[in-house]
């Protein structure tokens, strides 16, 4: 038996114990599951969701309404679609799908292996459905939006029992102005989970953010920087949009993180003084 399989079995046992403590006894399963998952479970309890609650298993909106929302999010879709397709090429035939959702958890577009897509459709994991946490319970899309952080939700970490066949990894996408725009998610069957998937989701969301920033500031002077030269040209590089007179017009999240400043503190300052 391989080490990964042993770790998966240990995780499953700890998760079963955690669910018993939380759902049957009302106690917090401290140390048994990720604190982020526990926070989400607590939010779901406050929402009044039960672990066996039945949520809508059909799309919440018709094609016309979905088209309207896709048009509303056309900027995100234009920059996100090529990345979705590239990610899917990396995981094709692994029983997975790639999802792009908006800031409210509405699934805008999906691409995936047909067999898994058909299974996912039975729990409304398809375009036009909302996976907001207050509707679907703990899930990577809704929880990543609530936490504004990358999230992996594996099997029975999902609040609702009928979603426990899923393993989902999602990473939020922020716009050039720092506003939360949506989330990129990679979902598959819990039994065939890949341990690199969360990293792939994080990298993909970073690439989309970079594309969004460069698109908005295509006519500005872009200054790229990083403390490590080998990171230049990667999604980890800082980018500042600068006016001809050297004023910072905007800076991406990677840039403000590198410099340890807030975006609002970088804007309208001379780049040489940032």
Where are the regions that the model predicts?
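Intrinsically disordered, low-complexity terminal regulatory regions
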Residues: 1-134, 139-152, 165, 174-245, ...
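PAS/PAS-like sensory domain cap-loop motif
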Residues: 113-116, 120, 255-266
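Helix-to-coil/beta transition segments that act as allosteric "coupling" elements at the rims
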Residues: 157-175
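Short, glycine-/Ser/Thr-/acidic-enriched flexible segments
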Residues: 158, 247, 255
